Amino acid sequence: MNQLCKVCGEPAAGFHFGAFTCEGCKSFFGRTYNNIAAIAGCKHNGDCVINKKNRTACKACRLRKCLLVGMSKSGSRYGRRSNWFKIHCLLQEQQTTSGLGGGSSVGSGSGGGVSSASLEQLARLQQASNQARQTYQDKTNPCIKSATATTSPRIEGAAVGTGIGGGASPSFLQAAKLHHQRQLKLDSRLSNTPSDSGASSAGDPNEDGVTSVLGGQIATPSSTNATSLPKLDLRHPNFPATSEPDADMQRQRHQELLEIFRSHSEPLYSSFAPFSHLPPVLLAAGVPQLPIFKDQFKAELLFPTTSSPELEEPIDLSFRSRADPASPMAHNSNSPSLSEPAAASHCLGESTNFVRKSTPLDLTLVRSQTLTG
């Protein structure tokens, strides 16, 4: 193929997006066609030269040249279609554009192949370039400045259109600009600060002056709808301050709201504080603290206590005679044991009652006499 790329001058690889381009320009246009807003504006006012060496230096100028040579989305292939079909679609689009123009000559040079879609893309690219340049130049608040720069021409056109006899005074245009700037500041302040009572009521003194200047010139939607009474400026120095009864009512209302909030915020009952309802005098008198109460409660759950004396008595494993069915633990705690024979004889001499000694259980291995037949 003897064709050259219409964008950078490199040997063309084929007919892509409605023009003979190389592979690099084809892929660049396919990536950036639907993402124009992400491209930064040209820092040299759109005077960059696009050729084979420096075609990657400025994306904005490269995309602008792609649109100028006739590249568009309608020229892209849907599936695997032949170059003949794409050239046929491009010719039909050019004929439709020339027919809508009423036979008028479309520009000279390469401008004859530019479609309406390309012109629309050029307009979008120019707008994005202006926004990016304004954002690049401004370092303090780029969002508000760029929005002001893009929307101020619309306000000027609207102001000129609403003027009497097609002519608008400079004071009216200046007032419209000031009003728009004030609205932008208010919107940014409301979006950046939380919605609190009285947070958005405070303003700058220059905004008060703008309000007084615009009072008789610009009719806001709220003023057009409400026709009963004029809107009073409460921040004016001649306006009387808030009266004392109103301040007392506001303070009382504030206290009531605080009490309601506290009553709803406190828990009704807490399982971790069983003695919270007791007065501090009883707590200081010896009521167990929370950790002690928890340990005691766990011990009672694991080892329940009963008042039955039969369960409190330990199990006796010793041998006892049939004549003494009582347990040795039922006697006095000072009863003699087998390990102290002297004390046992002394106790038997003093007492008139005979105490039978219990024989302990013998667990030794002793051969007993077995009855053999």
Curated annotation (Swiss-Prot):
Q: Which GO terms fall under molecular function for this chain's record?
A: estrogen response element binding; nuclear receptor activity; zinc ion binding
Per UniProt, subcellular location reads as:
Nucleus
Annotated DNA-binding ranges?
2-78
Annotated knockout phenotype: EG cells fail to acquire the neural fate or underwent an extremely delayed differentiation, while EW neurons produced neurites in abnormal directions.
Q: Name one Pfam family in it.
A: zf-C4
Biased composition annotated in UniProt, kind: Polar residues: 126-140, 189-200, 219-228
| Disulphide bridges | none
Q: Which SMART domains match?
A: ZnF_C4
Q: Which UniProt keywords apply?
A: Developmental protein, Differentiation, DNA-binding, Metal-binding, Neurogenesis, Nucleus, Receptor, Transcription, Transcription regulation, Zinc, Zinc-finger
Q: Where is this region: Disordered?
A: 126-149, 179-251, 323-343
What does the record list as GO biological process?
cell differentiation; central nervous system development; regulation of DNA-templated transcription; regulation of transcription by RNA polymerase II
A GO-annotated cellular component: chromatin
Q: Which SUPFAM superfamilies match?
A: Glucocorticoid receptor-like (DNA-binding domain)
Which residue numbers delimit the NR C4-type Zn fingers?
5-25, 42-66
What family is this? Answer: Belongs to the nuclear hormone receptor family. NR0 subfamily.
**Which function does this protein serve?**
May play a critical role in development of the progeny of eagle-positive neuroblasts.
Record-given protein name = Protein embryonic gonad
> Which organism encodes this protein?
Drosophila melanogaster
Lineage of producing organism: Eukaryota, Metazoa, Ecdysozoa, Arthropoda, Hexapoda
